[in-house]
């Protein structure tokens, strides 16, 4: 068991940002092993993975722009049918949390919405590769780059 798995072990509701999913889908040379470890954890009994429709948007924009509708469909299918990850809509309570997070930390709106929804759902960890989110204190921000040499 690696350090990422040890750090995630204490979290039963884990929110996942877009990048770890893209690394998994694209089998990214550097980050794929970390994404695999994350999804092993999400497959554990009593562990719930969540993400939001923001991830659907962010993941599908580039392939849509490239005319890769096959990838758009595959990413949508993966998110909608995943047994390890539940995709949430953004509701008013999550948006209100996002307002506070954006005001306090100056983070981008999509990140604030993702974290706001995570907090509203009871997540205690947010897995990302965006170091700018490390300052958020309301949730444990797990940054993939922190687990690489």
Predicted region positions:
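A structural micro-motif
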Residues: 12, 47, 85, 124, ...
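Short acidic, glycine/proline-enriched helix-loop-strand junctions
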Residues: 70-71, 75-97, 103-105, 110, ...
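Active-site neighborhoods of divalent-metal-dependent phosphate/nucleic-acid chemistry enzymes
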Residues: 2-5, 36, 85-129
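Short secondary-structure transition/capping segments
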Residues: 62-63, 122, 137-141
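Short, well-structured N-terminal submotif of metal-dependent ribonuclease cores
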Residues: 1-51, 64-73, 77, 131, ...
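Hydrophobic side chains within alpha-helical segments
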Residues: 20, 61, 114-117
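Short amphipathic alpha-helical elements of helix-turn-helix/winged-helix folds
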Residues: 23-24, 62, 97, 101
């Amino acid at each position: 068991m690696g350090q990422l798995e040890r750090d995630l072990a204490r979290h039963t509701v884990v929110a996942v940002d877009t990048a770890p999913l893209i690394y998994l889908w694209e089998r990214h040379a550097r980050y794929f092993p970390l994404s695999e470890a994350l999804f092993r954890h999400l497959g554990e009994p009593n562990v719930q993975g969540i993400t939001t429709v923001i991830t659907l948007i962010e993941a599908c924009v580039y392939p849509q722009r490239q005319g890769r509708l096959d990838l758009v469909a595959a990413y949508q299918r993966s998110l909608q049918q995943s047994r390890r990850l539940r995709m949430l809509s953004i509701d008013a309570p999550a948006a209100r949390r996002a307002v506070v997070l954006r005001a306090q930390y100056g983070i981008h709106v999509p990140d604030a919405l993702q974290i706001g929804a995570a907090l509203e759902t009871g997540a205690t960890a947010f897995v990302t590769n965006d170091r700018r989110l490390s300052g958020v204190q309301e949730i444990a921000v797990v940054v993939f780059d922190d687990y690489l040499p």
